[in-house]
């Protein structure tokens, strides 16, 4: 401070300028050095961050790549079956729906007094029965036929050989071995034919009766008109002359 007091203003200004320049240079050097030093770690840190962040960045990329390699929601089986088969057959329902096991007999020419209990008692001695029933109509009257279903086909054949042609209550039984396919095809055909016959009868009765009535009415009308014309044409010449004279007389008076 004493030196500056003794110095002139110009010298003080020069000194201040030189000190400022030195301080700036020192700061700049320190700053550069600090930057260099600090930059080294800073850059290293950034570099380390990049290096450390590289795997972080690469991990999502790997995850994306791994996501592409992940299996799809629906994966195709490695080994395909040689022969396609419907899933319905796995449960056994579809396979056994149209095929009926055992033996089934159709007994006909039965007396109308034979009941279900009589049929069951008659055929139960040959084997286990699944069903034995007489066929009845809607009014409850016997149709003279019955179904006898054995669990084993061999038992059904034995019963048919034993009882076919044997009289029951005075009427020989007619026994036939049938299959489920034939029986299912036969029964719907009977129901359709019965319905068709009933409908045809009703149609024929309705339209036929109406046609006859209409024809009768038309015939009556035709006959009435024809009879009237015939009666007019049967007038004699004298009657026609008399009618003409009467008409002329009316015209003259008017």
Swiss-Prot record:
<comment type="subunit">
    <text>Homomultimer. Is part of several complexes involved in mRNA processing and export. Component of the transcription/export (TREX) complex at least composed of ALYREF/THOC4, DDX39B, SARNP/CIP29, CHTOP and the THO subcomplex; TREX seems to have a dynamic structure involving ATP-dependent remodeling.</text>
</comment>
<feature type="compositionally biased region" description="Gly residues">
    <location>
        <begin position="23"/>
        <end position="55"/>
    </location>
</feature>
<feature type="region of interest" description="Disordered">
    <location>
        <begin position="183"/>
        <end position="254"/>
    </location>
</feature>
<feature type="compositionally biased region" description="Polar residues">
    <location>
        <begin position="183"/>
        <end position="193"/>
    </location>
</feature>
<dbReference type="GO" id="GO:0006405">
    <property type="term" value="P:RNA export from nucleus"/>
</dbReference>
<dbReference type="InterPro" id="IPR035979">
    <property type="entry name" value="RBD_domain_sf"/>
</dbReference>
<keyword id="KW-0509">mRNA transport</keyword>
<feature type="compositionally biased region" description="Basic and acidic residues">
    <location>
        <begin position="1"/>
        <end position="14"/>
    </location>
</feature>
<dbReference type="GO" id="GO:0003729">
    <property type="term" value="F:mRNA binding"/>
</dbReference>
<dbReference type="GO" id="GO:0006406">
    <property type="term" value="P:mRNA export from nucleus"/>
</dbReference>
<feature type="domain" description="RRM">
    <location>
        <begin position="103"/>
        <end position="180"/>
    </location>
</feature>
<feature type="region of interest" description="Disordered">
    <location>
        <begin position="1"/>
        <end position="79"/>
    </location>
</feature>
<dbReference type="InterPro" id="IPR012677">
    <property type="entry name" value="Nucleotide-bd_a/b_plait_sf"/>
</dbReference>
<protein>
    <recommendedName>
        <fullName>THO complex subunit 4</fullName>
    </recommendedName>
</protein>
<dbReference type="Pfam" id="PF00076">
    <property type="entry name" value="RRM_1"/>
</dbReference>
<comment type="similarity">
    <text>Belongs to the ALYREF family.</text>
</comment>
<keyword id="KW-0508">mRNA splicing</keyword>
<keyword id="KW-0507">mRNA processing</keyword>
<dbReference type="GO" id="GO:0005634">
    <property type="term" value="C:nucleus"/>
</dbReference>
<keyword id="KW-0694">RNA-binding</keyword>
<keyword id="KW-0143">Chaperone</keyword>
<feature type="compositionally biased region" description="Gly residues">
    <location>
        <begin position="203"/>
        <end position="213"/>
    </location>
</feature>
<dbReference type="GO" id="GO:0062153">
    <property type="term" value="F:C5-methylcytidine-containing RNA reader activity"/>
</dbReference>
<keyword id="KW-0813">Transport</keyword>
<comment type="function">
    <text>Functions as an mRNA export adapter; component of the transcription/export (TREX) complex which is thought to couple mRNA transcription, processing and nuclear export, and specifically associates with spliced mRNA and not with unspliced pre-mRNA. TREX is recruited to spliced mRNAs by a transcription-independent mechanism, binds to mRNA upstream of the exon-junction complex (EJC) and is recruited in a splicing- and cap-dependent manner to a region near the 5' end of the mRNA where it functions in mRNA export to the cytoplasm via the TAP/NXF1 pathway.</text>
</comment>
<dbReference type="GO" id="GO:0006397">
    <property type="term" value="P:mRNA processing"/>
</dbReference>
<dbReference type="GO" id="GO:0005737">
    <property type="term" value="C:cytoplasm"/>
</dbReference>
<feature type="compositionally biased region" description="Basic residues">
    <location>
        <begin position="214"/>
        <end position="226"/>
    </location>
</feature>
<dbReference type="InterPro" id="IPR051229">
    <property type="entry name" value="ALYREF_mRNA_export"/>
</dbReference>
<dbReference type="InterPro" id="IPR025715">
    <property type="entry name" value="FoP_C"/>
</dbReference>
<dbReference type="InterPro" id="IPR000504">
    <property type="entry name" value="RRM_dom"/>
</dbReference>
<dbReference type="GO" id="GO:0016607">
    <property type="term" value="C:nuclear speck"/>
</dbReference>
<keyword id="KW-0539">Nucleus</keyword>
<dbReference type="Pfam" id="PF13865">
    <property type="entry name" value="FoP_duplication"/>
</dbReference>
<dbReference type="GO" id="GO:0008380">
    <property type="term" value="P:RNA splicing"/>
</dbReference>
<keyword id="KW-0963">Cytoplasm</keyword>
